[in-house]
């Protein structure tokens, strides 16, 4: 078991930045008096781009996580400069620090976490706007090798699931359990499904292998290494809820209102980077390997898949407003954040992404990708 633990530690060291970026820590936000949230877009979608003033954007990145692949590719290929928006990147030490910086204007944009924004907003912070996506549906369910694949919620009844508290997937699953008329709780509470919080993926996976837990919820494509853990990838949270958000693009309210054009240009470059990622695997992996220092095969597994592994994590820049608002309400439903009467709809804005997409469609009317993304946007953003 010592050898096993050492293997896990070595493998997870390379993935830890990704795991940390998946959902975020539970922040302790500084409350402030709620302010009226504007329902009007910060700029007219049809306004000429050249007529708007564009100020630089300061964008936060966490470690060497590659989830914001569109941004990383766009930066490497000079797309931000081509679109006329100066983008300065800053590394942050923690999710809590990042959201505090965005809420106070120290950062304009942050590209990770879905839970942190909701926690800050529920605690009284009114200066955050979720304007786009980074990835979605990233939570996998692992168990000891030989465990049958999960086919339905009935397979989880009477079982114990280990997870990290900030994990998006565990919150989504708990809300689904409630909706189906079942209960969840801590050990000894007599719930239909028991959840145990652990500090990171190592004790969760080890516990499954030892028989201490029946399942564990992990993220950041750790299922790619399941066989090396003595574990098996037996399901996903996406089987129960699809779509649901993971990392989001979040900005400061003042940036949204006063520097809207810069956000649009940022998103255009981001979308161009996303298109490049879809069509140029080897070149994209070169960029990401140079940026992150991660194992190339694991990078491919995360973002493209391999012969033996299909990632559940979906790279998407779409705000997915409907799913995002539903997730924030789910956090209230399960008691993850206090019900303070927040109108979540007002904090998820879609006009930055839609304006960027409209301009790309005007620029490249025959590009099938922009049409595909436009159709998805119309379906998932009420």
Q: Which residues make up each language-model segment?
A:
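Solvent-exposed, acidic/flexible segments
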Residues: 60, 64, 91, 95, ...
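Pocket-lining segment of extracytoplasmic ligand-binding domains
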Residues: 115-116, 203-293
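Predominant activation on well-ordered alpha-helical scaffold segments within soluble catalytic domains
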Residues: 72, 118, 174, 224, ...
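Short linear loop/turn motifs
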Residues: 88-89, 96, 190-194, 301-308, ...
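Secondary-structure end/capping motifs
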Residues: 259-342
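Conserved C-terminal helix/tail region of periplasmic/extracytoplasmic solute-binding proteins
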Residues: 329-382
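Short, low-complexity disordered leader/linker segments with a strong preference
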Residues: 1-56, 362-382
């Amino acid at each position: 078991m010592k050898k096993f633990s050492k293997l896990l530690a070595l493998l997870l060291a390379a993935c830890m930045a990704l795991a940390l970026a998946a959902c975020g820590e539970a922040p302790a936000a500084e409350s402030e008096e709620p302010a009226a949230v504007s329902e009007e877009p910060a700029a007219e979608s049809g306004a000429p781009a050249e007529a708007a003033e564009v100020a630089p954007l300061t964008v936060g990145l966490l470690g060497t996580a590659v989830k914001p692949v569109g941004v990383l590719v766009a930066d490497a290929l000079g797309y931000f400069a081509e679109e006329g928006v100066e983008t300065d990147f800053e590394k942050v030490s923690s999710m809590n620090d990042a959201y505090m910086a965005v809420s106070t204007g120290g950062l304009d944009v942050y590209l990770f976490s879905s839970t942190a924004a909701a926690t800050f907003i529920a605690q009284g912070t009114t200066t955050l706007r979720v304007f786009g996506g980074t990835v979605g549906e990233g939570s996998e369910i692992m168990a000891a090798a030989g465990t049958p694949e999960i086919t339905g919620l009935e397979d989880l009844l009477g079982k114990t699931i280990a997870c990290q508290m900030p994990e998006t997937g565990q919150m989504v699953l708990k809300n689904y359990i409630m909706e189906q008329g079942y209960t969840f709780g801590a050990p000894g509470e007599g719930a239909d499904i028991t959840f145990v919080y652990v500090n990171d993926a190592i004790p969760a996976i080890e516990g499954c292998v030892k028989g201490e837990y029946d399942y564990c919820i992990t993220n950041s494509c750790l299922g790619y290494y399941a066989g090396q853990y003595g574990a098996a990838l037996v399901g996903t949270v996406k089987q129960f809820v699809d779509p649901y958000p993971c990392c989001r693009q979040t900005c400061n309210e003042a940036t949204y209102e006063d520097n809207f054009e810069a956000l649009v240009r940022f998103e255009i470059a981001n979308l161009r980077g996303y298109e490049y990622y879809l069509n140029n695997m080897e070149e994209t992996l070169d960029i990401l390997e140079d940026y992150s220092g991660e194992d190339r095969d694991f990078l491919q597994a995360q973002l493209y898949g391999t012969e033996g592994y299909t990632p559940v994590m979906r790279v998407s820049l779409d705000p997915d407003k409907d799913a995002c608002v539903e997730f924030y309400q789910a956090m209230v439903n399960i008691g993850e954040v206090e019900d303070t009467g927040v109108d979540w709809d007002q904090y998820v804005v879609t006009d930055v992404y839609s304006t960027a997409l409209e301009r790309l469609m005007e620029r490249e009317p025959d590009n099938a990708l922009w049409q595909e993304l436009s159709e998805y946007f119309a379906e998932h953003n009420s």
